[in-house]
Amino acid sequence: MADIKQFGLDLGIYGPLAEPEIVINLAKYAETAGFSSIWLADHVVFPKHFDSKYPYSATGGFPAPIEDPLLEPIATMAVLAGSTTDIRIGTAVLIIPYRNPVLLARMLITIDQFSGGRITLGAGVGWLKEEFETLNTADFALRGRVTDEYLEIFKSLCSGQEVSYHGETYQFDTVYSVPGSIQKPNPPILIGGIANPALRRVIKYGDGWLAVALDPIRMKERIETLKKLCVDSGRRFEDLELVYKIFINPGEPKKGPFGEREIGSGSEVQIIDDLKNILGSGFNNVVVRYRGDSAKEQQKQMERFTEEIIPKL
């Protein structure tokens, strides 16, 4: 049987339930129930009009109304660090190019300090070009290279020592970064994404991989690719933390980006089979997200997950 410590909970900080009291209460529930971690997605603003395609849906449309409430994840992490005591707090994922890399690193280091070393950085390159343009912090076309360099900067500033950096997209002369992060050499970095560049980024910069929206066939193929990259680079696959983020949608099955049934949608039996397959494929942790229409409904769904679904895994 699966252990609840194999599961994290995405708190849903965009959508109708993105309210401070609801988010804090759900975080406290997750800690009391025994979940290993709580997770936050990242958008700063949604442009009213955009042509960018969401990469994890069959239609390319974003799966939530863009005019719904939206909370910023780093500020929310700081609040949750003070509202909880033991549970880990992660981003799934933080869009690295959205923020100045030095300020981003210092904010995350500060939260790591206040939380007693409980943060995990799930890192992604982003997909919403129009949001990049609104924030005006990085060129969308260069987001992969920018992410790589910003992760290098993050790691160096976590050292708590004198740091300088001179890359292609960002440079600074020697600064003091004191204190460094509690977690050494830095808080764990999980690279989000399922394409080959993301897997290569896992090998070069990550402590693990954060996957989403993979059907069983592609899941197996992506893991085999990651194993091969580990062999080629001399890294141990067994040392990587593998995390899968799943949206739970009970009821009528939904279509995934390739027309297949979306993982996590359908009947209870189908959802249980999906979770068994994910855990059986080698993932260490599963981050679940229920979309409820109310705080009461979301709480009910999570109680059912912990009391009825997990014991069947």
Predicted feature locations:
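Active-site-adjacent structural elements that line small-molecule/cofactor binding pockets in enzymes
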Residues: 1-313
